């Protein structure tokens, strides 16, 4: 029999993940939670770093922002959660802190993975799935909601249907982004030239960065051969990397690194024809927005963390030592240095040639030198990464 308490859930809190890319990968789980509890009030507790991703999410009712760590943060969160009288806590991160907050806040039903010694703090602890290292992270988060589905309805459909990882940007924000780009003298938004964003940094891992001189060579080629406008994007912490790329270029890119809040960056990415990036948060954002996204992978595992979209492709050399998951390479960074600008440009050229995969806005794509290969449809893509 289904658990009766779960049919009376009125107020739900979801403890979100801490990094932007991870937050995007939780979207299918959040969307299916709304399907499971269509009339409940759902609050997402998240850090300010990720809150702007969800400000317009139709599957959420409220955002609860928290910062910092340690005892003070725990006390603050416990007070906030108690005041809101949540009936159910869905804990997406694996930390003991998140389970401690839910337990001390006296949330009656607490579900999450039984990791980090927190099993006794959860009312519904889940074992880690044995497939975690071989399936996409989207399914790791979705598995928690699938367990809830079983407890409520005695059926599991969420893991057998195509997850929806898409995000939308309101027209008003797109218009504001257009004005922002005009202010930065981006002509391509009005005359049909390609608008290509490049994210050469990575906040939490130097090993994930493709060399700056190669990004510079790639960007120059986009400008010389495709007539593209180039946007260098990233957070303030990545400004030095973007400056190095800019200084190594013959042409002039537009430096947006460190000049946009996440909400502005999301809106700008919704307008680009292509994003070329390392394995970073913007890769997941652009793909979720339905923009063609080319990700250069090195030490991380694309099987589990590539952007969850058929519009996202990867370039990878895959030496024997990859994926090592290290943040600093102890040897010669061969997973990244083996990838040449010509290889990335050719893949990008093919992606840009698929006009049907982008918006109908006309642009002058790079010249095609060979027929375009067929692209897998969305269902086939999902089967490849499950």
Residue ranges and their predicted role:
Residues 1-386:
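Catalytic machinery of carbohydrate-active enzymes
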């Amino acid at each position: 029999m289904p658990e009766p308490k779960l049919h009376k859930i009125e107020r739900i809190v979801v403890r979100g993940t801490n990094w932007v890319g991870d937050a995007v990968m939780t979207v299918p789980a959040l969307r299916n939670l709304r399907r499971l509890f269509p009339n409940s009030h759902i609050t997402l507790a998240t850090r300010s770093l990720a809150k702007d991703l969800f400000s317009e999410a139709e599957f959420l009712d409220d955002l609860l922002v928290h910062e910092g760590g340690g005892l003070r943060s725990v006390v603050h969160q416990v007070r906030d959660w108690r005041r809101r009288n949540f009936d159910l806590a869905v804990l997406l991160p694996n930390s003991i802190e998140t389970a401690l907050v839910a337990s001390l806040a006296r949330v009656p039903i607490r579900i999450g993975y039984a990791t980090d010694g927190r099993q006794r703090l959860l009312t519904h602890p889940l074992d880690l799935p044995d497939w975690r290292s071989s399936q996409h992270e989207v399914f790791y988060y979705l598995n928690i909601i699938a367990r809830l589905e079983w407890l409520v309805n005695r059926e599991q459909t969420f893991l057998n249907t195509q997850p929806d990882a898409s995000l939308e940007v309101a027209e008003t924000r797109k218009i504001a982004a257009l004005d922002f780009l005009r202010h930065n003298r981006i002509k391509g938004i009005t005359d049909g030239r390609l608008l290509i964003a490049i994210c050469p940094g990575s906040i939490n891992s130097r090993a994930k960065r493709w060399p700056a001189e190669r990004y510079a060579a790639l960007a120059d080629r986009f400008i010389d051969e495709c007539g593209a406008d180039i946007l260098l994007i990233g957070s303030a912490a990545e400004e030095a990397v973007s400056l190095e790329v800019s200084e190594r270029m013959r042409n002039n890119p537009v430096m947006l690194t460190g000049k946009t809040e996440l909400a502005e960056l999301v809106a700008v990415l919704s307008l680009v024809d292509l994003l070329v990036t390392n394995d970073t948060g913007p890769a997941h954002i652009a793909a979720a927005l339905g923009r063609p996204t080319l990700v250069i992978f090195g030490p991380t595992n694309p099987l589990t963390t590539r952007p969850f979209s058929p519009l996202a492709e990867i370039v990878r050399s895959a030496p024997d030592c990859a994926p090592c998951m290290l943040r600093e390479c102890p040897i010669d960074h061969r997973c990244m240095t083996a990838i040449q600008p010509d290889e990335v440009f050719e893949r990008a050229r093919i992606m840009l040639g698929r006009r049907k995969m982008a918006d109908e806005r006309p642009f002058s794509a790079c010249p095609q030198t060979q027929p375009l290969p067929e692209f897998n449809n969305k269902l086939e893509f999902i089967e490849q990464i499950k």
